[in-house]
Curated annotation (Swiss-Prot):
GO cellular component, one term: membrane
Annotated protein name in UniProt: Probable metal-nicotianamine transporter YSL18
Composition skew (Basic and acidic residues), residue ranges: 1-17
Location, primary (coarse class): membrane
Length: 679
């Protein structure tokens, strides 16, 4: 494998901190850091849970966690100073510990499958998709106690699986881990005089945008006293387009996600919405009663929903398989290139004039600190074996659809997937955990079979693998942050363990609130598109579904098109074509098949804001754009818990604003007039 190094030109970062001693790891994990992490972990877990239930798209909140952690602890130390009892100085290492702990807690909403495999197990999803697979063996209700026990069993294994590889990835191959590096540079900048002033402006912006988004959500709620009511149902492009889902809802969450997501993803989603909701949906609906039973509900996978869901699955699988093959070939090529280079160097080993890489001051200091506090590999390996053994015994008792050999097989190959995923994340921030999840579901659903509970069984195994693979890549990214901020690896491990333990309790509790009012109707707020995809894959793999007419042929066509588009993107990138930035993302298009087009339109509005901001003030856009986006997402997400509780206890908004066509309005006026005369 070739080394991917950090750029060493330019001013030294560590020279600015040379006079500051690096505190021992026991002083980096402090009580105030843990308290701040708990507060931020609960808040961001609620925000992330709102995202997995609405769009299924999860942006990185690392920057938000680092920024808010800096704000809380800085305010804490300032308050103590004013009270005359100053505490220990607030260091960048403590800031990194808070960021690691918070992200470990909040990211479990995705790796824990709360909007995907876990939700796909329940009876409500089975009934809404109506595939005839809602027997007791094919459903499993998400109970709080069982969820918490399951996550305590599987969530810590991913940490131990990747610990032995930290030196190889961070020191030897110098993988960049873009997200971890960006977070580290941000934290480093906070703790310089200029960076502290800029951080104050960023904190002010995130608070103001969060409050604005929160109050906008509250204001909108008062006018949603019925179906299709409120400003979110404004027929921006006319009633005909509105009936097909094309309108602007100005949802703070989606606009914020659009500001963070690449332009290509947002435009790809809009393109996919036009294909699925604008072209494919009306055509297939015209075949109702011919291709599928007209008496079935649209959400039934044997009716219209089957075309929509399985076309999306085909595209996602096509993209995933292509990317897995591509990264495997790249890895083999890189290994061979490294071996050839090593042999060449050995053949010239007697030549003293060979150029040798010289480490910069920053690299020397960071490497020294990173290697100083050792985490024994024997501890990690033995811990993995012990936890895997316990899980192999206990999980079949919790879920009767799986056997001990299914669990053992998952734990046997999961570390390989974890390494591959962490390596891809380190090179180019390419996280393939979702693709691994889908392949695992297909394999184990086929192995277990529909009669033996293959649907739930494969989803449980998916949960085990997902927890290991996703956690491992996130943890290695945190190691990169700790390397660049001179944070002890032991402090990083301890903070990750604390954050994971928090997530095992906080996320099931938050999920329980959301699950009470979860609706699968695509016109409702909580669409949970990934739950339908994951259950559809499990049903397909287990062989328990008869698809509607021509569904398989149409899905196969989309699968081939996905491979073609992926191949075109690869060739364009290799050949440096000018058209390469305009080739759409397959997964972006696929996700939009299961979301109303209003989501992709709002995300494109976010993209447009960033584009115009970049043209006016590129530096300001780069510094404050992600902060503004995070504020919009957090503000709207914070209202999700009160919204859930209001819906849970049937509290109805007092006003309904609805937009009608002229003909409908005339009929309504005539009806009201007749009622008035009769009265």
């Amino acid at each position: 494998m070739e080394s991917v190094g950090d750029p060493r030109d330019g001013p030294s970062t560590e020279r600015a901190f040379e006079g500051q001693p690096v505190p021992p790891w026991t002083e980096q994990v402090t009580l105030r850091a843990v308290v701040a992490s708990v507060a931020l972990g609960v808040a961001l877990s609620s925000v992330m849970m709102n995202l997995v239930f609405t769009s299924g798209i999860i942006p990185s909140l690392n920057i938000s966690a680092g920024l808010l952690g800096f704000f809380l602890l800085k305010a804490w130390t300032r308050l103590l100073d004013q009270l005359g009892s100053p505490g220990r100085p607030f260091t960048r290492q403590e800031n990194a510990v808070v960021q690691t702990c918070v992200v470990a807690c909040a990211s479990m909403t995705y790796s824990g499958g709360f909007g995907s495999y876990l939700l796909a197990m329940d009876r409500k999803t089975a009934e809404k998709t109506s595939t005839g697979d809602d027997s007791s063996a094919s459903v499993s209700e998400p109970e709080f106690g069982r969820m918490m026990a399951f996550f305590f069993l599987v969530s810590f294994v991913g940490l131990l699986a990747i610990v032995p590889m930290r030196k190889t990835m961070i020191i030897r191959h110098r993988l960049t881990f873009p997200s971890g590096s960006a977070t580290a540079h941000l934290i480093n900048s906070f703790h310089t005089p200029h960076g502290a002033r800029q951080a104050k402006r960023q904190v002010s912006l995130v608070l103001r945008s969060s409050l604005a988004s929160l109050f906008w959500s509250i204001f909108q709620w008062f006018y949603t006293g019925g179906p299709n009511c409120g400003f979110t149902s404004f027929p921006t492009f006319g009633l005909s387009a509105f009936n097909r889902g094309f309108y602007i809802s100005l949802n703070g969450t989606y606009v914020g996600i659009g500001m963070i997501s690449p332009h290509l993803i947002n435009v790809s989603m809009l393109f996919g919405s036009i294909i699925s909701w604008g072209i494919m949906r009306p055509y297939i609906r015209s075949k109702r009663g011919i291709w599928y039973d007209a008496d079935l509900q649209e959400t039934n996978l044997k009716s219209f929903s089957g075309y929509k869901v399985f076309c999306a699955i085909a595209m996602i699988l096509g993209d995933g398989i292509f990317q897995l093959v591509a990264i495997s070939l790249r890895t083999i090529h890189t290994v061979r290139h490294h071996q050839v280079a090593a042999e060449t160097l050995r053949s010239f080993s007697d030549v003293d004039a060979m150029p040798r890489p010289v480490m910069s001051f920053d690299d020397r200091r960071r490497t020294q600190v990173f290697l100083r506090e050792h985490i024994p590999s024997t501890f990690a390996i033995s811990g993995y074996v012990v936890l895997a053994t316990v899980s192999t015994v206990v999980i079949p008792l919790m879920y009767g659809q799986v056997r001990y050999y299914h669990v053992a097989a998952a734990y046997a190959f999961a570390p390989v997937l974890a390494f591959c995923n962490a390596y891809g994340t380190g090179v180019a921030e390419t996280n393939f955990s979702a693709q691994y999840n889908k392949l695992v579901i297909l394999m184990f659903a086929s192995w277990i079979g529909i009669k033996n509970g293959g649907i739930v069984g494969s989803l449980v195994i998916c949960g085990i693998v997902s927890s290991i693979v996703s956690t491992a890549s996130d943890f290695m990214s945190d190691f990169k942050t700790s390397y660049l901020t001179l944070t002890s690896p032991r402090a990083t491990l301890v903070s990750q363990v604390i954050g994971t333990a928090m997530g095992c309790v906080v996320n099931p509790a938050v999920f329980t609130v959301f699950h009470h009012f979860y609706e699968m109707n695509p016109n409702k707020t909580y669409q949970a598109p990934l739950a339908k995809i994951y259950r559809g894959i499990a049903v397909l793999g287990a062989g328990g579904l008869e698809l509607p007419k021509y569904c398989l042929a149409i899905s196969a066509t989309f699968f081939v098109l996905a491979l073609a588009v992926c191949a075109m993107r690869e060739v364009a990138a290799h050949g440096k074509w000018r058209a390469e930035p305009y080739i759409p993302s397959v997964t972006g298009m696929a996700v939009s098949f299961l979301l109303v087009p209003a989501v992709s339109i709002d995300m494109c509005i976010g993209s447009l804001i960033v584009f115009l901001w970049n043209r006016n003030d590129k530096l300001g856009s780069q510094v404050f754009g992600p902060v503004l986006a995070s504020g919009l997402i957090c503000g709207d997400g914070l209202f999700s818990i009160p919204y859930a509780l209001l819906a849970r206890y049937d509290v109805t908004p007092p006003i309904c604003i609805r937009f009608l066509g002229r003909v409908q309005n005339d009929k309504l006026d005539a009806f009201l007039a007749s009622k008035a005369k009769a009265g």
